[in-house]
Amino acid sequence: DAIVAILFPDTTGCPIVQGAFEQGLTDIPWYFTDGVKDSATLIECSQGALEGFKGVAPGVSESAALESFKALYSAATNGENETFIFAPQAYDAAMLMILSAIANGTDGKSIAGGMIAASGGGTPCIGAECIDLALAGEDFDYVGASGPIDLDANGDPTAGTYDIYQIQGSD
């Protein structure tokens, strides 16, 4: 037996966790989603009762593409912020759309139709390198900040990276 909790810390997290713990549901393993991974609020309202509980969230593969993204993000925020959950994935989605628009045209149908090609089959590239290849009319294979990006015939990712996290202390 286990409890899978799909929560958001500032809206549903604390009331649900507190109510469940008041009913004695602390001896059952809990598994959380990405919505509470970085939530100090949920940790505070649980008063330590979440110790050892686990969750799953989008992850990233360490790579040159990720380091490039982190450097760009740091520069854009004047070094004041680290990247956050979903940031690499959102960046990758935007880059695929931008690259497809450059290579195929700027109307919605052209962008959508070119995203699969942008994710594979050409010269592997990161960020601005891909833009240069697209502008030159060359085939390219966008290497994502979140990890390898390969879309299937429906435009769905064929793989992804996930982190399993465990709540420890006040982390």
Set out the residue ranges of the language-model regions.
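Extracytosolic ligand-binding ectodomains
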Residues: 1-171
